[in-house]
């Protein structure tokens, strides 16, 4: 009996020592508020959709005209824009008004752009449906361009299905894409920017948001889903 008592005493002593050691451990300095599992589960009320869900929603509809924005929607083109900023206006964004930049961007620097996987998947889905695809960009128009060529190659579009890229331009206070979307009777438009979704809403057509990559040169990032539009899941790449 005495041995049993000694064993329990030793165990109790060990636990008391462990408590003393733990009591002396200092927590590191907090660097953020942190997050709980409950908070992680409370996602924003966004209407997420997948490529498969979009395709299913169109299954009973005939082929239609649909449109895509280009930069940050089907192409990650930040390398060219970053190069242009460094070369023409490192301290501000005035390079976007410089014709020399657009000549480079529209004819050479898309060689450094990467096609987004979501762009390939969506384009291929619409091609399979027989839809007529238009690319409408806010880039400034130049006398020559190779953007059409790069898109055709990068997104695997057959030559006879590829429409020439439409350069709508970017005028302050004016959404130049609307007239082009109306002219081509688009029924659906994909874009990463608020202006893309606003243009679709203006014409009462279906606007679907593509997520802009967090490392895009186009900052700040927009609030996807803020207009109640559908947002394609995992579309940042």
Curated annotation (Swiss-Prot):
Please give the superkingdom of this protein's source. Answer: Bacteria
- A Pfam family reported for this protein in Swiss-Prot or TrEMBL: Acid_phosphat_B
SUPFAM superfamilies per UniProt: HAD-like
| Binding sites annotated in the UniProt record for substrate | 137-138, 177
Q: Which cofactor does it need?
A: Mg(2+)
What does the cofactor field's note say?
Binds 1 Mg(2+) ion per subunit.
Reaction catalyzed:
a phosphate monoester + H2O = an alcohol + phosphate
Residues holding Mg(2+)? 69, 71, 192
Keywords per UniProt: Hydrolase, Magnesium, Metal-binding, Periplasm, Signal
Q: Where is the active site?
A: 69, 71
* Protein family per UniProt: Belongs to the class B bacterial acid phosphatase family.
Subunit structure as annotated in this protein's UniProt entry: Homotetramer.
Q: What protein does this entry describe?
A: Class B acid phosphatase
Q: What does the record give as the organism's lineage?
A: Bacteria, Pseudomonadati, Pseudomonadota, Gammaproteobacteria, Enterobacterales
């Amino acid at each position: 009996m005495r041995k049993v008592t000694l064993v329990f005493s030793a165990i109790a002593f060990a636990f008391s020592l462990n408590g003393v050691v733990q009591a002396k451990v200092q927590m590191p300095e907090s660097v953020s508020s942190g997050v709980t599992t409950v908070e992680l589960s409370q996602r924003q009320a966004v209407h997420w959709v997948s490529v498969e869900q979009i395709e299913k929603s169109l299954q009973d509809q005939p082929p239609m005209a649909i449109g895509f924005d280009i930069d940050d929607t089907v192409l990650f083109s930040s390398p060219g824009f970053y190069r242009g900023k460094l070369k023409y206006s490192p301290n501000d964004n005035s390079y976007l008004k410089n014709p020399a930049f657009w000549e480079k961007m529209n004819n050479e620097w898309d060689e450094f752009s990467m096609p987004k996987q979501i762009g390939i998947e969506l384009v291929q889905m619409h091609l399979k449906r027989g839809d007529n695809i238009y690319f409408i960009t806010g880039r400034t128009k130049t006398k020559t361009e190779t953007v059409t060529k790069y898109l055709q190659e990068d997104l695997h579009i057959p030559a006879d299905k590829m429409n020439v890229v439409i350069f709508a331009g970017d005028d302050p206070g004016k959404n130049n894409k609307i007239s082009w979307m109306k002219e081509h009777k688009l029924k659906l438009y994909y874009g990463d920017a608020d202006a893309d979704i606003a243009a679709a809403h203006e014409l009462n057509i279906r606007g679907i948001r593509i997520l802009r990559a967090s490392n895009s040169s186009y900052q700040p990032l927009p609030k996807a889903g803020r207009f109640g539009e559908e947002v394609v899941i995992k579309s940042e790449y």
